[in-house]
Amino acid sequence: MDKVAKRYIERYQKAKAFREQWVPLFEECYEYALPQRESFYYEEHGQRRDDKIFDETAVVGVQEFASRLQSGIVPNYARWADLISGSEIPPEQREAIDNELDEVTEYVFEVLQNSNFSQEIHESFMDLAVGTGILCVEEGDSLNPVNFSAIPLPHVVLDTGPDDRIDHVFRERKKVKFDHLPLMFPKGTFDNKVTSQMGANRETTVLEIVCRDYSTKNEEAYLHYAICM
């Protein structure tokens, strides 16, 4: 196994072991407040998770929490942010630059409103009610330039860096077909062990990592890895 891949897998396993201490508490929160979301434990498809709910207070409360966050921060069909020139821009140039940035902002929100952002951010806010919300933003195509997906918390493991801020996000994706890897990671490189499994309808587990690149000074840069485990 590649040394870089081995290092990240070891870090993931260590972070996951630390998270396991909190899984029973998270699972109980999900059972009472978010029974429709995926469990931290293995379950069969279609298995009921609402047998412990005798009062709808928590379930309704989470829905209202997510709706209020969405309407207050990122309301549907509204321009909730603007791109404007910063303080380093000379005053005599700001008006012209602001006009150009206004066109960029208009295009950005046109893309957002025609995407699945509203639906996915709502699910992410529901996860935020009991823990951490994770919203994955991926490059799309000419029809859908940007794709959003709210990643269920059971799929994600977080780790912190030297400043106690989250600098590693691990996502374990199970039952991924080898044939789908070139479509999922068009810029990826695949060794012979991976390519030899393609075309045989075989599956693998993929560990995705988004991590801070500390080698880049004076800039908040991140790296994206995908490892077949």
Question: What does each of the following model-derived ranges do?
Answer:
Residues 1-205, 211-221:
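Extended, helix-rich architectural segments
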Residues 224-229:
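Catalytic nucleotidyl-transfer cores of nucleotide-processing enzymes
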